[in-house]
Each structure stands twice: as structure tokens, then as C-alpha cells.
């Protein structure tokens, strides 16, 4: 299981940080299995923020858990919160790792690694040029704000 992989890789974790919305449930459940406190961050005016009385203690060893990591952008925003709190990032974990090129410097522990190609709009293969473009994810959904 993902919890067992995390336990083997990261010996010292004080806190789990999960970005809303997708990371909340997986972060909570992994935290329960590992007996670790879990908090989440949520977007306020487009930026991840700790709310609801959550905080990261100075020096805490923090694991970021998400449902899916594709570009790593949400994870990098979480890293900023950890640094701002003078805490330490121990690593990243997710159910599905879709990364190919990412700015995440730490190893990603995942249950599944998927290699799904992404294309620049100028270099689309002919067989997908006629398919309408959609952008999944919750980053810009207005109903969340």
C-alpha cells in the first residue's frame, strides 16, 4: 500500500500537508494509517493558505500528499508554506504520479506511475487534432472560491 511505501522511505514524519481539494481525503487516510497529524491548505485569492486553525510548527518534518501529481505546481506551492514556517520538507507522496518534467527536487513516492504524454499545441499528433481541448482539475473552478 502507499502507506507502507511511505513508512519504508520516510522514517521521521511529524506532519502531513495535503492541498485541497484532491489531496484532502488521501492525506487524511494516510495520516490515520501512519498515526500522523494531517492538515490541509486551500486556495484563497488563488494562493494556497493554511486556514481553519492549521499551522506548521517550526522544525516540523512535513510530507506533502496529493491524489495526483502532474506538473508539481500545487506541491511547489505547499513547499512555500513549509519554508515560510521554517519547517522541513521530507518528500512527496501521491496515489498517481503523472510527472515527466517537474521542478520537484525530492523523490515522489506513488502507488501508480503513469506515463501520459502531453503536447504543445503546435506539435499535436494528427490523430488528436480534432478532439476538443479540455482542462481537467480544480485549480481554476470558480465555485471553489
What are these regions (language model features)?
Residues 14, 60, 90:
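Conserved acidic residues
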Residues 11-20:
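Short glycine-rich phosphate-binding loop at a beta-alpha junction
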Residues 1-12, 140-145:
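Active-site-facing substrate-recognition patch
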Amino acid at each position: 500500500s502507499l502507506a507502507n511505501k511511505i513508512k519504508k522511505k520516510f522514517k521521521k514524519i511529524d506532519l502531513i500537508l495535503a492541498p485541497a481539494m484532491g489531496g484532502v481525503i488521501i492525506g487524511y487516510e494516510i495520516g490515520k494509517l501512519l498515526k500522523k497529524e494531517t492538515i490541509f491548505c486551500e486556495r484563497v485569492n488563488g494562493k494556497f493558505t493554511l486556514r481553519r486553525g492549521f499551522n506548521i510548527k517550526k522544525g516540523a518534518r512535513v510530507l506533502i500528499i496529493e491524489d495526483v501529481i502532474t506538473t508539481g505546481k500545487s506541491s511547489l506551492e505547499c513547499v512555500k508554506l513549509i519554508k515560510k514556517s521554517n519547517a522541513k520538507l521530507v518528500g512527496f507522496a501521491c496515489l498517481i504520479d503523472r510527472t515527466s518534467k517537474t521542478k520537484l527536487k525530492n523523490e515522489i513516492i506513488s502507488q501508480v506511475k503513469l506515463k501520459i504524454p502531453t503536447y504543445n499545441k503546435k506539435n499535436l499528433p494528427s490523430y488528436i487534432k480534432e478532439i476538443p481541448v479540455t482542462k481537467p482539475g480544480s485549480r481554476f473552478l470558480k465555485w471553489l472560491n
